[in-house]
Amino acid sequence: MASLKSIIRQGKQTRSDLKQLRKSGKVPAVVYGYGTKNVSVKVDEVEFIKVIREVCRNGVIELGVGSKTIKVMVADYQFDPLKNQITHIDFLAINMSEERTVEVPVQLVGEAVGAKEGGVVEQPLFNLEVTATPDNIPEAIEVDITELNINDSLTVADVKVTGDFKIENDSAESVVTVVAPTEEPTEEEIEAMEGEQQTEEPEVVGESKEDEEKTEE
């Protein structure tokens, strides 16, 4: 469990104040949830990035707020891609004994037999909904695809649960499949198709049979 310090923001802040705050390398944030009132704080952006890389998206953080330390998770955050900057964070104070349902990424492991034979690995499901207490939420769920041949697939029911958590997705939902490669047409087939297009005479729209007879005369 990683720790992060925050500083309480006093009073109401204007857009100009928040802009200046971000320019100084700080991120405005709010803390709310279990056992705490809503508190406006600020955290160092670089330190926050270090912590989130350590604990991952669903990890628990010990957040210092004033004289207290609160166990929180990142409920949400906003990111400005143009400035490459985190602009706001929502910290959710949590009860460590209370289960939560969150999205956990699926990580494919190994190289499928079918892929070695030219098949294509398709992954329709990139995240699984997982219910667990905060300290039992996995960083990722590994799915071994080594034994998959072409036209083989794995569903949610095939995913091995190796921790104290429950997967909430429909058991029949497809996680990964290996499909046959798309066959490219041969040169002979391409030439044949081009020949068919050239032999087809375009039909003149609006030309009647009577017009055709006059033309023949």
Swiss-Prot record:
Q: What does this protein do?
A: This is one of the proteins that binds to the 5S RNA in the ribosome where it forms part of the central protuberance.
| Top-level taxon | Bacteria
Q: Which GO terms describe its biological process?
A: translation
Concerning InterPro entries, the annotation shows: Rbsml_bL25/Gln-tRNA_synth_N, Ribosomal_bL25/Gln-tRNA_synth, Ribosomal_bL25_b-dom, Ribosomal_bL25_C, Ribosomal_bL25_long, Ribosomal_L25_dom, Ribosomal_uL5_bac-type
Q: Which cysteines are joined by disulfide bonds?
A: none
Q: Which GO terms describe its molecular function?
A: 5S rRNA binding; structural constituent of ribosome
Compositionally biased spans, kind Acidic residues: 184-205
**Family assignment from sequence similarity:** Belongs to the bacterial ribosomal protein bL25 family. CTC subfamily.
Q: Which organism is it from?
A: Staphylococcus aureus (strain MRSA252)
Q: For bias kind Basic and acidic residues, which ranges apply?
A: 206-217
Query: A Pfam family in this protein?
Result: Ribosomal_L25p
Q: What is this protein called?
A: Large ribosomal subunit protein bL25
Subunit and partners: Part of the 50S ribosomal subunit; part of the 5S rRNA/L5/L18/L25 subcomplex. Contacts the 5S rRNA. Binds to the 5S rRNA independently of L5 and L18.
- Gene name of the record: rplY
Q: Which keywords fit this entry according to its UniProt record?
A: Ribonucleoprotein, Ribosomal protein, RNA-binding, rRNA-binding
Q: Where is this region: Disordered?
A: 178-217
Question: Mind naming one GO cellular-component term on file for this protein?
Answer: cytosolic large ribosomal subunit
